UniProtKB/Swiss-Prot annotation:
Signal peptide: none annotated. It comes from Nostoc sp. (strain PCC 7120 / SAG 25.82 / UTEX 2576). PANTHER family: 30S RIBOSOMAL PROTEIN S20, SMALL RIBOSOMAL SUBUNIT PROTEIN BS20C. SUPFAM superfamilies: Ribosomal protein S20. Keywords: Ribonucleoprotein, Ribosomal protein, RNA-binding, rRNA-binding. The keyword rRNA-binding applies. Residues 1-20, 75-97 are annotated as: Disordered. HAMAP family: Ribosomal_bS20. This is Small ribosomal subunit protein bS20.
Length: 97
């Protein structure tokens, strides 16, 4: 464990940041899952309402991913990759519907 006050403080700060980052990453994953379920609902029943719901959830997921990147929780390339994968889920369904 830490041998002096500054090392102890850094350990406490690291733990605080770890918990904060974990909750933020968890919320990103939750919003991504919500979006994917909305896309599946739209694929099963392509209505304008379900498409709007999917687009709304996509915007929410994009927003949370961008904020995580801005705060340094996710690497910029990781955020871009997540956003790209989310967009690629809806695009083929929109073209066929």
């Amino acid at each position: 464990m830490a041998n002096n006050k500054s090392a102890l403080k850094r350990a406490q700060i690291a733990e605080r940041n770890r918990v904060r980052n974990k909750t933020y990453k968890s919320s990103v994953k939750t919003l991504m899952k919500n979006y994917l379920s909305a896309v599946q609902a739209y694929a099963a029943n392509p209505t304008p309402e379900s498409k709007q719901e999917a687009q709304t959830r996509l915007a929410a997921a994009y927003s949370r991913i961008d904020k995580a990147v801005k705060r340094g929780i996710l690497h910029p390339n990781n955020g871009a990759r997540k956003k790209s994968r989310l967009a690629s889920k809806l695009k083929p369904i929109e073209q066929t519907a």
